[in-house]
Design a protein with these regions (language model features):
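C-terminal beta-strand-rich structural cap/linker in extracellular carbohydrate-active enzymes
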Residues: 79-80, 676-700
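Aromatic-rich carbohydrate-binding modules that target alpha-glucans
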Residues: 28-77, 85-111, 142-159
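Primarily marks secretory-pathway-exposed extracellular/lumenal segments that are disulfide-
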Residues: 20-24, 699-817, 833
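Active-site-proximal helices and loops of the catalytic beta/alpha 8
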Residues: 139-141, 318, 386-388, 392-397, ...
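Substrate-binding/active-site clefts of carbohydrate-active enzymes
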Residues: 201, 205, 215-394, 410-425, ...
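Loop/helix patches that line or flank the sugar-binding groove of alpha-linked glycan CAZymes
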Residues: 218-235, 493, 502-663, 681-682, ...
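C-terminal membrane-anchoring or membrane-association module
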Residues: 836-851
Length: 851
């Protein structure tokens, strides 16, 4: 995810003598814990000013364009800035930011130099842990418990642990030890995976979003008491044990799901609050109104049940992401009650004087949700520590960050850095996905640049790994899959833009449904009610009763599960759960026994597509290339060096055939086929074809035949029987020129135009010697014409011209080839005739003039 170890070494302990392959005494003697700052560039003076002493500037020394300054600092967090020729600037090598007073600065986090630290290196099946002493040089007082099976090298101060015999799955080691002087080492976490999952990349993800209270009720003893909220807005009893049961049943694995994203675990508010309409009462069943920072909501389960759920997921090769709320809390939250200064006192977002964009950093979502002030260092540090606690305590694998654009940039940068330093010690990526809700504002790419730029703002080397792809959602779900206002050429274009408009290396999350929008099947179904209605009195969408709605969802998921990124399935979408706007889009998950045949068929098809994605490197990691698009048909390829997948979507009511010059694909889903370079696509279909071993494309791609150019006039002395296009250079015997001119002028449509012979049935090609000169001539052909590919001894050749062109019947080899359409031959003869006639007439006229 991020290479934060470099930043850690540079900014917190920075100058460290070599610690490997040296004598222990030498290591102790040369160890140095001063902090080094550097700035590169041309300047007259460069200084550092920091929170350690705002009254004293520290001059930096220049050496070959690099300015260096060293300080000995006590443990703590410090604001600072560089002063370059009297201009105050951030440290360009340090992305971390913080506020001192009302001024934003670079910040540095300094550790206690007396305490030892660990350095981690995982290479293949070998984990190497280096002990780095504190400033007094004392060695380790023993071996960390989780390294008890390792080998110790006292010279290099290293433990080496062989992990080849570890069970497949996730392992998290905690390294804790004192040195011989009693100094406590900074503890270190070392999470890593063994087995197939060790090769996992987050672009391999198929994410399944679970709104826990609305999923499966696995333990009725913790069912919540009704709050009296409006219909659809109260607690309904889903819990962590229900999720565990579904993991252990194999439901997710059978669907190809390998990542679960669950809504917040925190204890949420009791009672109700007013919905945005100010009329309806709603509860906190969704978890986004936290009141406790480090407590599992008892209506969802216990800490032990959360740990059991995560362990079950890991045993199944499934990663678990938490949902972390960074923008706000509920007014009953402990922090708001005890530390009101940690929160902004802003207007209510979306009201007439409080624009969502202009006031995005300090407005409140509702009056009962205080907005976190990330400029307050105490608040910032506490919310980051809480995030680390959840990830560590429950061995989670990543997080979805809620409402990203409503917090200061430093909130994301600092959170990302701390998570990276704590959990990515052995190279295991922790995926951080953001929610930056944007839109799609028009067909022109330029019109959408602000949308892309806002999402990109929070990603990159020091930012989030990816975000929900809101631009793509609104471009294609709003306009293609649900309304049909736009066609598959539009779908192709905006899918391609998601590949080139986002921060390089980011792993975006495409989706067609979520807890914030009406269910996709209800948006595609116009027969049961307005999909944007929220409340029962307005008339809510019902269960669709037609095939078209389910076909639309399959088209959408056929695209989603084969497109690049880490696609997300919203719980229930896989079988076509219906519903209007929030909260009606959050029905409880229905068991398969309550599905109808349409729902069962949809779920089976989406499961097959998910499994296919899981099994295909091309569908997970391949590049996206559009091969064909029309209003109703889209064909694109996902390809790696070793394999490729051909995805074929047809929303039309008729079959289609497309010439694609591809070969060696095997149908893996659906019924589209490629035969001799022709792709046949059934109506209303989704198909995926797979080709393995892409190492030799030359033998797998049917090349277009090269057009042979030459003389095509059969009466010419240089007639080329292989020529398909006339080169205009035919030559003739001198004594036949006038005859040819006269004949061609008088008979500019030759007798050949009257020959109508089926090119596939001209002659019997069974090699039983039934073909003869008589048959050939009766068919209007020329017997024993010369053709270089039929040059074996005693070969019989018949050349026939009909309305389809020249047909060469190479009898002994049972070959037949159409060279040139007859119309082209006739036009060529006419052209040559006119030219020759003009020459003759010109000569005669000149003779008459006595020239």
């Amino acid at each position: 995810m991020r290479k934060s170890l470099f930043i850690f070494l540079l900014l917190t302990v920075v100058i460290i003598s070599p610690l490997t392959q040296v004598e222990a005494d030498e290591t102790i003697e040369n160890y140095n814990r001063s902090i080094q700052f550097s700035w590169t560039g041309s300047a007259t003076t460069v200084e550092i000013l920091g929170e350690w002493n705002w009254d004293e500037r520290i001059s930096m020394i220049e050496n070959n364009g690099v300015w260096i300054g060293e300080l000995n600092l006590s443990e703590g967090i410090y604001c600072y800035k560089f002063i370059v020729d009297e201009e105050f600037i951030f440290d360009p090598s340090n992305p971390l930011r913080g506020y001192c007073g009302d001024i934003e600065n670079s910040i540095i986090r300094v550790k206690d130099s007396t305490r030892p630290i660990f350095e981690i290196d995982l290479q293949g099946q070998e984990l190497v842990v280096t002990f780095i002493p504190g400033k007094d040089g004392a060695g380790p007082a023993g071996t960390p418990t989780d390294l008890s099976d390792s080998n110790w090298d006292s010279e290099s101060l290293q433990w080496t642990l062989d992990i080849s015999n570890f069970e497949d799955g996730k392992h998290t080691l905690r390294l804790e030890i004192n040195d011989t002087n009693g100094n406590i080492a900074y503890d270190e976490l070392v999470p890593f995976w063994v087995g197939e999952q060790a090769e996992f990349s987050w672009e391999d993800s198929l994410i399944y979003m679970i709104l826990t209270d609305r999923f499966v009720n696995g333990n009725t003893s913790n069912d919540p008491i009704s709050t009296g909220a409006a219909q659809g807005a109260d607690w309904q009893g889903g819990d962590l044990e229900g999720v565990t049961q579904m993991i252990e049943s194999g439901y997710f694995s059978e669907m190809g799901v390998n990542v679960l994203w669950l809504t917040p675990f925190n204890t949420a508010a009791n009672g109700t609050g007013k919905a945005s309409d100010g009329v309806h009462d709603v509860s906190s069943f969704h978890g986004y109104w936290p009141v406790e920072p480090r407590q599992v909501d008892p209506r969802l389960g216990t800490e032990e049940q959360l740990k059991s759920m995560v362990n079950a997921a890991h045993d199944a090769g499934i990663r678990v992401m938490m949902d972390y709320v960074v923008n706000h809390v509920h007014e009953d939250h402990t922090y708001y009650q005890n530390n009101p200064e940690w929160f902004n006192q802003g207007c209510i977002c979306g009201t007439s004087t409080c624009d969502w964009t202009e006031n995005r950093l300090d407005c409140q979502f509702t009056s009962y949700m205080p907005d976190v002030n990330w400029k307050n260092r105490n608040a910032s540090e506490q919310f980051i520590e809480d995030a680390l606690w959840w990830l560590e305590e429950f061995d989670l694998d990543g997080a979805r960050i809620d409402a990203v654009k409503h917090v200061d940039d430093l909130a994301i940068t600092n959170l990302v850095d701390r998570i990276s330093q704590r959990f990515e010690t052995a190279g295991t990526d922790y995926y951080l996905k953001g929610e930056t809700a944007m839109g799609w504002v028009g067909h022109e790419l330029a019109d959408n640049q602000e949308q892309y730029e806002t999402i990109n703002r929070y990603m990159g080397e020091n930012g989030l790994d990816g975000q929900a792809d809101f631009v793509l959602y609104h471009a294609v779900v709003d306009n293609v899959f649900t309304t049909g206002n736009e066609n598959y050429q539009h779908l192709d274009y905006w899918t391609s833009r998601s590949q080139d408009q986002y921060e390089q290396g980011s792993i975006m999350v495409p989706f067609v449904g979520s807890h914030d929008v009406p269910r996709i099947i209800s948006r595609a179904d116009t027969g049961t009610g307005d999909a944007w209605n929220q409340w029962s009195e307005d008339g809510l969408p019902g269960q669709p009763g037609n095939d078209e709605s389910y076909q639309a969802v399959l088209q959408a998921y056929g695209w989603l599960l084969t497109t690049p990124g880490a696609p997300m399935i919203y719980y229930g979408d896989e079988y076509g759960e219906f519903g209007g706007a929030d909260p009606d889009n959050r029905h409880s998950f229905r068991e398969s026994t309550n599905w109808n045949e349409r729902e069962r068929s949809l779920q089976e098809n989406i499961s097959k597509l998910g499994q296919l994605r899981l099994q295909s490197d091309a569908l997970r990691r391949g590049t996206y290339e559009s091969l064909y698009n029309s209003p109703d048909v889209l064909v694109f390829e996902r390809a790696t060096e070793k394999s490729s997948a051909l995805v074929v979507l047809n929303r039309g009511e008729s079959n289609d055939s497309i010439s694609l010059n591809l070969a060696n694909y095997t149908n893996a889903f659906g019924s589209a086929i490629i035969l001799e370079g022709l792709l046949t696509v059934p109506s209303n279909s989704v198909s995926v074809l797979i080709r393995e071993n892409n190492s030799s494309n030359e033998s797998e791609i049917i090349e277009e035949p090269e057009i042979i150019i030459g003389c095509t006039d059969i009466n010419a002395t240089n007639y080329d029987v292989n020529a398909e296009e006339d080169d205009g250079n035919c030559t003739y015997e001198d004594d036949t020129i006038n005859d040819n001119v006269n004949n061609n002028i008088e008979n500019n449509t030759t007798n050949l135009t009257n020959i109508t012979i089926d090119q596939n049935n001209t002659l019997d090609n069974s090699n039983d010697d039934n073909s003869s000169q008589e048959e050939c001539e009766e068919a209007g052909g020329i017997w024993n014409g010369d053709w270089e590919e039929c040059n074996e001894e005693d070969n019989q050749i018949c050349i026939i011209e009909d309305e389809n062109g020249l047909i060469i019947d190479c009898e002994d080899y049972n070959q037949k080839r159409t060279f040139m359409p007859k119309a082209v031959i006739v036009k060529s003869i006419l052209l040559i005739s006119v030219i020759l006639a003009s020459i003759v007439l010109f000569v005669i006229s000149r003779q008459k003039d006595g020239v």
